[in-house]
Design a protein with these regions (language model features):
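Beta-strand/loop-rich accessory regions of lumenal/periplasmic or secreted enzymes
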Residues: 10-12, 18-27, 36, 50-272
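Short acidic/polar inter-strand loop motif in beta-rich domains
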Residues: 36-42
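C-terminal edge beta-strand
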Residues: 45-49
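Solvent-exposed serine/threonine-rich low-complexity stretches and specific carbohydrate-binding patches
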Residues: 2-12
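Local beta-strand/beta-hairpin segments that build beta-sheet-rich folds
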Residues: 2-4, 44, 106
């Protein structure tokens, strides 16, 4: 087949390089040669790479906007209310102000993002909202917001799919002279009886199976990409794909805080 050759400068004792590859079926020979301009000879390492048949690559099987059974199409009631199968979500900007499961409220108060600056807590307040998409399978909204009493500018977007998944993105723009945020916290207040069992978190590079031990009062951890709180009948699941743009001291163990009782809920300290 066609040979491809490319050189890479060596920087340090360990280095990762990306070798161009068309990723097509077949057997590839990889040859690594290490040489130094002022020395004769080279170190040569050869390896084989076998790419098996990949008949699914590039096809569109299963890619559809169809609402699959038993879910139902999204229902739009206005004023930020969107219904999905057995549930109703009410949005205030990027976050839920209420979610009801079978008519039972899950949140005991709206989800809240707040910035602590110079000892004062400034809540995020939505100033504009626009609907960007309203399909049976997916809803998209976006808008602007402010942290009351600060010069921070905020742009946000949110999308929801017919299975009840909702994802929010919030971008903060500081003033030209800069601004110090002592803490940025996202609080999800939940109905106390829902915060009974904990599941999720990482274990040896994978998601942990089974329930997590906790005393039902306070549970603290560093960054975790996934946490599910529940009782025997209902639950609330949070996930974040990475801790990119989270700012915290190394080893911090208060980035994810779960509380039970009257203060039940999940709190994320994005900046601490």
């Amino acid at each position: 087949g066609k040979a491809h050759e490319e050189g890479f400068p060596v920087r340090g004792e360990e280095q990762t390089v990306h070798v161009p590859c068309e990723f097509k079926e077949g057997e590839y020979t990889l040859v690594y040669r290490l040489s130094q301009p002022d020395r004769e000879g080279e170190v040569r390492v050869t390896g084989k790479l076998m790419i098996p048949p990949l008949p699914w690559v590039g096809n569109r099987i299963g890619v559809t906007n169809e609402v699959l059974s038993p879910w139902s199409p999204l229902a739009y009631s206005g004023k930020g209310v969107i219904g999905c199968w057995n549930r109703s979500y009410t949005f205030d900007g990027p976050f839920l102000s209420q979610a009801a499961n079978g008519g039972n409220p899950i949140l005991r108060a709206p989800i809240r993002l707040s910035a602590l600056i110079d000892g004062t807590d400034h809540p995020l307040t939505t100033t504009s909202t626009q609907s960007d998409m309203q399909r049976p399978d997916r809803a998209e909204t976006s808008g602007k917001a402010v942290f009351q009493g600060t010069p921070l500018k905020v742009a946000w977007s949110n999308w929801m799919e017919y299975d009840g998944l909702t994802v929010a993105t919030v971008a903060l723009e500081p003033p030209p002279e800069g601004l110090t945020i002592d803490r940025l916290s996202l609080t999800m207040p939940l109905r106390p009886d829902i915060v009974k069992y904990l599941r999720g978190t990482r274990h040896m590079g994978a998601l942990r199976n089974g329930r997590l031990p906790w005393d039902g009062k306070v549970w603290r951890r560093g960054f975790e990409p996934y946490l599910w709180v529940s009782n025997e009948y209902e639950g609330f699941l949070y996930f974040c794909e990475s801790e990119a743009n989270w700012v915290h001291p190394d080893g911090a163990q208060d980035l994810l805080v779960v509380k039970g009782g009257e203060d039940a809920g999940i709190a994320l300290n994005l900046i601490s």
